[in-house]
Amino acid sequence: ISASSSYGGNPMACAAALASIEVIEEEQILENVREVGAHFMQRMLKMKENHPIIGDVKGKGFLLGIELVKDKNTKEPFDEAGKLVYQKAFAKGLAWIPAGHILRMSPPLIMDKEYADMGLDIIEESITEVEKEFGYR
């Protein structure tokens, strides 16, 4: 019976983890995530007010989501709209992973407000186009 393992207490992995933590602290990455994450949520809440197919917006830091629904009262998921918004935004240069009726976002932790706004502008344009296609506007 061995008292050690290949994955526990690996000095190289520990050094890499410590170096990563030091960079996060020195470059104030968490502060950026808090500030820009709050900006994301502010913008997304405004989008929710202005778009009939946005049922809800959720997020903390840089883990964000926009829920697309057919009706805000019933909250019926709108998968078709999610697919089209994803495709339109991707064609405009926004790279992300489709997730049905949830527009899921997890940008790099170093993203600033300018790039956040660029991405949200693309998403909002794409949502507006999809709403027109489905007769919501």
Regions found by a protein language model. Give the residues of each.
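Conserved N-terminal phosphate-binding loop of PLP-dependent enzymes in the Aspartate aminotransferase
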Residues: 1-137
